A protein has these predicted regions:
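Preference for solvent-exposed, low-hydrophobicity sequence contexts
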Residues: 1-160
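Extracellular/virion structural assembly segments
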Residues: 81-90, 98-101, 118, 128-139, ...
Length: 300
């Protein structure tokens, strides 16, 4: 219960201001239902989260867009996890990927169905990673467009791009969305010590380490600017390791300044740490195996 009290009307009207600030912390994902009861009469509202103002009515946006701030072509690679999230208010939708394969000097189009008859009024998260669309018989996947009714999202598959950090965040609309950093990571562990004089000697009583990392996006295409601005305001962020969400983390600072100069490429920086009290992590190297357990260990 958020508002449970008596109100005194002014000129016969009761106004509750900043209702969005009261309800926003209660919406953990994309959508939440709230029931308002006044004088025994109730009305239920279905609220869709958006942390920024959108330049079109909610119904029009939901019918024509995925729940993402990215509206132009995106870059991806074969080892990346990609996903789209949608909410169709009134009708069931099918999701297809229109792929383009390069085979020598020929481009071969091919349509692949990813999901069918997704129910209306529900939030649907669909995996559209490029690894799911590989077709060696047709050639090398170079581009694909995700289609869901009027909604479109185009990915350009790069054979050369790499990333040094992958994060999964709840974006502007509360939907999970991955983002990839191509720049370097700058580690800046901060160690604090509490010392005391014990039996004539100075001894450390407590040593704490806060493992902070500063990550650089590298040059961004214009369409990625809004994605990383979403990351700067995100409340929930996780590390993405091999396409799997792992440790929660906290963004402590973000530099997202950019211009509209056609000759400039924006590049942002983010400072972050793991959310756990012990933020330092020791990654144990694993020796790769050549053969599985059916072979003699001598060969490994």
């Amino acid at each position: 219960t958020v508002l449970s009290c008596s109100y005194t009307p002014v000129d016969g009207v009761v106004r509750v201001y900043d209702l969005d600030r009261l309800l926003s912390p209660l919406i953990t994902g994309v959508m939440a239902d709230f029931t308002f009861t006044v004088g025994g009469s109730s009305q239920t509202l279905h609220l869709i989260q958006s942390r920024t103002r959108v330049s079109m009515p909610a119904a029009d946006f939901l019918d024509s867009h995925f729940l993402s701030s990215v509206t132009s072509e995106r870059d991806t690679t074969m080892d990346r996890k990609e996903m789209v999230t949608l909410l169709s208010p009134t009708e069931a939708v099918n999701i297809t990927a229109t792929c383009v394969y390069a085979n020598g000097e020929t481009c071969v189009p091919q349509s692949v169905q990813l999901a069918s008859a997704l129910a209306a009024g529900q939030v649907h998260e669909v995996d559209c990673s490029p690894s799911l669309l590989v077709n060696d018989a047709l050639g090398e996947l170079v581009q694909y467009t995700i289609n869901a009714g009027e909604r479109l999202m185009t990915f350009r598959v790069s054979p050369t791009q790499t990333h040094r950090l992958a994060l999964l965040m709840r974006n502007n609309f509360g939907a999970w969305e991955p983002c990839y950093f191509q720049g370097m990571n700058e580690h800046d562990p901060k160690i604090t010590r509490e010392l005391a004089l014990v039996a004539g000697s100075v001894r450390p009583l407590k040593i704490d380490e806060e493992d902070t990392c500063k990550s650089y996006t590298g040059p961004l295409r214009p369409g990625a600017v809004q994605l990383f601005r979403d990351l700067a305001r995100a409340y929930e962020v996780k590390l993405l390791d091999g396409g799997v969400a792992t440790d929660p983390l906290v963004i402590s600072d973000a530099e997202v300044k950019h211009t509209d100069d056609d000759g400039s490429l924006p590049a942002f920086t983010f400072s972050w740490r793991r959310a756990a009290r012990t933020s330092a992590m020791f990654d144990v190297p694993v020796i790769p195996r050549i053969f599985d357990d059916t072979f003699d260990e001598t060969f490994n």
